[in-house]
């Protein structure tokens, strides 16, 4: 029999990272510092790239957009998490929750496409250096960037549309520190099987496509590098590609586990830790990963610092 007089929740309660009061001040300070570093690092990288004409090439245009998306992703998740740790942001309306997830879905998916586009750019630059200016034109670069953001937007629209069919009448407690689709499905009183299928098909397809693009691109890059006889050329290629591969590995690992592994009705703390990794930790690491081993970025930073002194 169907339930009668069901109360549909209009607000959710985010449990946050921890329920232990003694840990909240320390966690707040730690993640506040991480968020500050994320904003400074990524916006600083964007400013550096756009102020240096020598960096106005596709490789750094992709990198500046990656920094923008990392800032977007972190700003979607971290402020709410910080308020939650202060016991001031636990309650969130259904509309706010869906808006946060929509913003989160756009940024996460866009980053997947950007990482794939960056891998193709490195393939073109290293495997076809003489033809690179012809292959990776400014027009193609802008198109790849536009497709990345459009793909992220459309993917978010699909999930948001299927999320709107759900009702929440049993529990309004979300065992997470932000509104993600999986925790929402776990508390839905509507059968979420279709939503899980949509996640598996669309999220899985996007991740498989982008990961395969990265792997195929870097397989060709690796063979090309091994054929090089110049030690300097090998070091430069490995330095550039190594940073990208590290970023890709750190980003895709948690995502694959979160959205492609079989769904479970149980609340898993491991899922929350993995989410923390790619929503908070990766955005602060990317500027470091891409900058410290990049001579052009370091040189540009030195020039900017000299001008400021």
UniProtKB/Swiss-Prot annotation:
Extracellular side: 1-28, 78-93, 166-198, 261-271
Glycosylation sites noted in the Swiss-Prot or TrEMBL record: 5
Cell compartments where the protein resides: Cell membrane
Membrane-spanning segments: 29-49, 57-77, 94-114, 145-165, 199-219, 240-260, 272-292
SS bonds (residue pairs): 97-189
Key word Mitochondrion present: no
A GO term from the CC aspect: membrane
Biological process according to GO: G protein-coupled receptor signaling pathway; sensory perception of smell
Molecular functions (GO terms): G protein-coupled receptor activity; olfactory receptor activity
Keywords: Cell membrane, Disulfide bond, G-protein coupled receptor, Glycoprotein, Membrane, Olfaction, Receptor, Sensory transduction, Transducer, Transmembrane, Transmembrane helix
Protein's membrane topology: Multi-pass membrane protein
Cytoplasmic side: 50-56, 115-144, 220-239, 293-309
UniProt family annotation: Belongs to the G-protein coupled receptor 1 family.
Annotated function: Potential odorant receptor.
Protein's name according to its UniProt entry: Olfactory receptor 5H17
Lineage per the UniProt record: Eukaryota, Metazoa, Chordata, Craniata, Vertebrata
Gene name, Swiss-Prot/TrEMBL: Or5h17
């Amino acid at each position: 029999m169907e339930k009668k007089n069901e109360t549909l929740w209009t607000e959710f309660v985010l449990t946050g990272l921890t329920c232990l009061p003694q840990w909240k001040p320390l966690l707040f300070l730690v993640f506040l510092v991480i968020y500050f570093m994320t904003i400074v690092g990524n916006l600083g990288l964007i400013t550096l790239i756009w102020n240096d004409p020598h960096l106005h090439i596709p490789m750094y245009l992709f990198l500046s957009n990656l920094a923008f998306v990392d800032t977007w992703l972190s700003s979607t998740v971290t402020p709410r998490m910080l308020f939650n740790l202060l016991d001031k942001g636990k309650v969130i309306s259904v509309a706010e929750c869906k808006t946060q997830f929509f913003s989160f879905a756009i940024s996460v998916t866009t980053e997947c496409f950007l990482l794939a586009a960056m891998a193709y750019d490195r393939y073109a630059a290293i495997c076809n250096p003489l033809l690179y200016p012809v292959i990776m034109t400014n027009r193609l670069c802008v198109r790849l960037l536009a497709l990345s953001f459009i793909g992220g937007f459309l993917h978010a629209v699909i999930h948001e549309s299927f999320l709107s069919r759900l009702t929440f009448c049993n529990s309004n407690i979300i065992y997470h520190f932000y509104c993600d689709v999986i925790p929402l499905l776990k508390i839905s009183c509507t059968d979420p099987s279709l939503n899980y299928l949509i996640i598996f098909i669309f999220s899985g397809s996007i991740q498989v496509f982008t990961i395969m693009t990265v792997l195929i691109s870097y397989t060709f890059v690796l063979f090309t590098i091994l054929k090089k006889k110049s030690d300097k050329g090998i070091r430069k290629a490995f330095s550039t590609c190594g940073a990208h591969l590290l970023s890709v590995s750190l980003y895709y690992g948690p995502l694959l586990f979160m959205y492609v592994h079989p769904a479970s009705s149980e609340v898993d703390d491991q899922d929350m830790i993995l989410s923390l990794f790619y929503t908070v930790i990766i955005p602060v690491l990317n500027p470091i990963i891409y900058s410290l081993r990049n001579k052009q970025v370091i040189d540009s930073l030195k020039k900017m610092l000299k001008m400021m002194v």
